[in-house]
Amino acid sequence: MMTKPFLPLLLFSSSFCLLAFDDTSTAPSSNNGVVLEVDGTKLTLADLEQKHPFGLFQARNAFYQAETRALDEFATEYLLEQQAQKEHVTVEELLERHANSVVPKGEPSEEALRLYYEGIESKEPFEAMRAGILEHIRQSRMLKAKTEYVQTLRSKAHIAVSAAPPRAAVSLKDTPVRGVAANAPVTVVEYADYECPYCQQVQPALDKLETEYKGKVTFAYKDLPLPMHPHAQKAAEAAHCAGAQGKYWEYHDMLLATKKLEISQLKEDAGALKLDTKAFDKCLDSGEQAEAVKAQNAEAQSLQLQGTPSFFINGQFFSGGLTYEQLRGIVDEALKASSAPVPEAAKR
């Protein structure tokens, strides 16, 4: 069964354009048709895409989100209507009948009611609240039973939403990559911040993904140091300084593992990796790699990415600290779309 997809969200960008878009899945067959006329000048979607590529992508992505939500909700409605017809009742009667059959008939114990009462911290006396508490508990149980019933119906059905998302072709120029394989069918691009706790939390899932999908996935990391994290900028610079000595990823992994980002610790980490510490210290103190970090940050800002981690997986946008199960599902779908087999190590 296909569960509700992770719905990408991409915001309107500035005119600083660093991405090329390949979103013909939701675009008209041609961008050359006239869609706007201003004072006799005829303009096409191609004109809009040239002026505001991220804005057009945002519009198509917003449509994709709305479309997939509507289709997913329609699938649930359809299943309920079909089941109701089989039982010769309305959908409302179907849900009510099922809930009544599983929700306990008796009242909760007096102790349970008083525990609930204490939890709401009401100024009203218990006796005045008792009837309301009972009704709230009953309604909560009914809602839970109905929700579980719907989930059961969905789990027994095959639901496949065919709407295809718009995709962005993210440039990997001057971007650290690993897990590189010839013609790897999946590319995961992460915008992240070394001081972001969610970026630190998602790293084990990415590591596991790299191990189990070896040769199938290429990983890229782009810097997006957030203003509220005082150590993030220099930590990113330090990783690039290590990269200048051929140990970007080793240093990258150490930063996310130790979570200690003071300047003194950054330099100590360089020594632990047996880098040329004199050259590293000079690189870090002089801000030699500051522009490299700022360039990737500017790219993220042009997309108006507002949080980390943010991912582009084969061009589709996902936001937040995805779990391994979520990442695996996305990658498996990408492999399926590319006709590449899922590795045995990743099968469950």
Which sequence ranges carry the predicted segments?
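C-terminal cap of thioredoxin/glutaredoxin-like
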Residues: 135, 139, 143, 159, ...
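Core regions of peptidyl-prolyl cis-trans isomerase
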Residues: 41, 76, 129-156, 234, ...
